[in-house]
């Protein structure tokens, strides 16, 4: 049920980067691509695809990244701007509730919630579902170099094995 979904606010390497630090990630069917051991997986058995979701207040951005698998977003609420290219300058589209976008593999993309604030939604909260192809979607995020640099400046380091280390939280980078 929708009201039983449990978000993870530390799912990705940009969880401490200002402007991206208010994201919520949901893994509904399958483990998805979260980099955090704190991510709650609602149904771990996946039937050949993963369904997740992203939610965030207006002004919050999901940093530029790409995937090894196909990705489809279905807008549930809010107004979202999707942008692509290594620096996010190769194109963009704005989507509303009910709109669907399919993004190809190996293309850097990001998205921002651009919902207008109003009395019924004072923080401009938006929500969208994400569908990832394949049973092995875990660890399938490739971050743009500038995203990795910004994350390190805010204490998050992504190891080669996909483990996220939070140096501001007292975690240390293993030797080797």
For the regions a protein language model found, what residue spans apply to each?
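A short, N-terminal "cap"/entry segment at the start of jelly-roll beta-barrel domains
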Residues: 1-48, 158-176
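Conserved short histidine dyad/triad with adjacent acidic residue
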Residues: 32-39, 50-67
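Short histidine-centered beta-strand/loop micro-motifs
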Residues: 39-44, 62-67, 84, 92-94, ...
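A structural connector/turn signal
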Residues: 51, 61, 70, 90, ...
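Glycine- and acidic-residue-biased ligand/ion/polar-headgroup-sensing regions
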Residues: 58, 68-81, 85-86
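Histidine-centered metal-chelating micro-motifs
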Residues: 60-63, 81, 98-101, 105-110, ...
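Short acidic-glycine-tyrosine-enriched beta hairpin
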Residues: 74, 86-106
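Double-stranded beta-helix
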Residues: 108-176
